[in-house]
Design a protein with these regions (language model features):
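Basic, amphipathic alpha-helical segments enriched in Lys/Arg and hydrophobic/aromatic residues
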Residues: 271-333
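An anionic, glycine-rich sequence signature occurring as long contiguous blocks
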Residues: 64-88, 92, 146-151, 155-257, ...
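Electropositive nucleic-acid engagement tracts
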Residues: 1-36, 109, 140, 165-190, ...
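Short, basic/hydrophobic alpha-helical segments
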Residues: 1-7, 94-121
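Short amphipathic alpha-helical "interface-anchor" segments enriched in bulky aromatics
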Residues: 19, 23, 185, 245-276
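Active-site-proximal, Lys/Arg-enriched surface segment
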Residues: 1-80, 195, 206-207, 211-212
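Short, surface-exposed basic-aromatic patches at helix termini and helix-loop junctions that form
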Residues: 14, 115, 134-144
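Long, low-complexity C-terminal extensions of enzymes
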Residues: 315-366
């Protein structure tokens, strides 16, 4: 799937991928790998927990020339709690791994493919994955990580540079001796800059300050960016010290595209609704949902808006709204049915009334 995207889409020299996890609800004690997990979207009922699977998912974040940022899911790994392992039959040959390890395996899978294509890889993660077990394995394969820092992250300044002719005993230090307080840096009035950033489909000014620091989980120097919003401030970082603040801000904003993926895979394709119990079968059907989602997006990439969706029959809708994934799927369904109808008409001519009736039915169905 990744090779198909690399060959088909007009991607630049830098590939941006997003990693995050999402739950799918399942029911029944015989569903292997399912357990009680934290619910990230409790909703009006305030349902703090749910029973089901947790999927650590890797998506390719791209920017469509007309429709903006979107993500193409590529691969996922199923997270099973350690206490749940006893319920899985031993002959399934399933081993325990944390979310951080699963995310690192996804990076180790995609990194050689991207490198072989002659491109660089940036990985965007949320704060839950900014930990040493993930960062160390990821940096080992030559990948740049963009993420969000904790506001109390244990940052230090850069190690002191030696003066000319000065020598130091032992190995050169990686980390500085002085701690850096993000809260104090954010509260200081000086050092702020303004830049135009394209985030969430809009180009807006962002107030930020940036500096270099050392961070032990990242194994050395990182680029830190503090962004000031209306009522709060947020710290981000890049393991590439040469990355600009605009690149970091825009890359992290594109992380939101995977959330739309999770919504579409569940609501449009019905991920989690397949009635299977075997843990490997669950893994297979989830990937089918991911890949059919990506193939539909790939099919509609170069098609104009009018071919994908027609909002004339919905005057209450916003005509400028970009086509949703459901619109793209309906457009593909419509094309398949029209092709089938034209094939039948070529074999045996059909009455005009039958063709008109079939066209009306397709309009209602799609």
């Amino acid at each position: 799937m990744l090779l198909l995207l690399l060959r088909t889409l007009p991607l630049g020299d830098r590939i941006l991928a997003v990693i995050d996890d999402t739950p799918t609800k399942r029911y029944g004690p015989q569903v292997e790998g399912a357990d009680i997990h934290h619910n990230p979207t409790p909703g009006p009922a305030d349902q703090k927990y749910l029973y089901g699977h947790i999927w650590v998912t890797l998506s390719l974040a791209v920017r469509h020339p007309c429709f903006g940022a979107l993500a193409l899911p590529l691969r996922a790994m199923l997270y099973v709690r350690r206490k749940t392992m006893a319920k899985i039959p031993k002959w399934r040959d399933w081993t325990f791994a944390t979310k951080l390890v699963l995310a690192a395996r996804l990076v180790e899978w995609i990194a050689p493919i991207v490198k072989q294509a002659g491109k660089t890889l940036w990985i965007v993660v949320d704060g839950g994955y900014v930990k040493a077990p993930f960062l160390k394995r990821t940096l080992r394969v030559g990948v740049t990580v963009i993420g969000r820092l904790r506001k109390d992250a244990a940052l230090r300044d850069l190690p002191r540079k030696l003066r000319r002719g000065e020598r130091r005993r032992g190995r050169p230090p990686k980390y500085g001796k002085h701690k850096i307080s993000l809260a104090k840096r954010a509260a200081h009035r000086e050092g702020w800059e303004v830049a135009q950033c394209t985030v969430y489909g809009q180009t807006v000014p962002k107030l930020y300050k940036t500096f270099l620091a050392t961070y032990r989980p990242a194994g050395g120097v990182i680029r830190v960016v503090i962004v000031e919003e209306d009522h709060d401030w947020y710290p981000f970082f890049s393991t590439d010290p040469n990355a600009t603040a605009v690149e970091i801000i825009e890359s992290f904003a594109d992380r939101a595209t995977i959330e739309q993926d999770f919504h579409d895979v569940k609501e449009v394709w019905g991920a989690g609704q397949q009635q299977v119990r075997n843990i490997w079968t669950n893994l297979a059907v989830y990937h089918l949902n991911l890949w059919i989602h990506t193939l539909v997006e790939l099919w509609s990439w170069s098609r104009p808006r009018g071919e994908i969706c027609d909002r004339r029959q919905s005057p209450w809708d916003d005509t400028d709204r970009r086509p949703s994934h459901a619109d793209r799927r309906k457009a593909l369904q419509r094309q398949i049915m029209e092709h089938e109808l034209s094939t039948l008409a070529a074999v045996q001519p059909l009455p005009r009334k039958i063709l008109q009736l079939a066209q009306r039915l397709m309009d209602l169905a799609c």
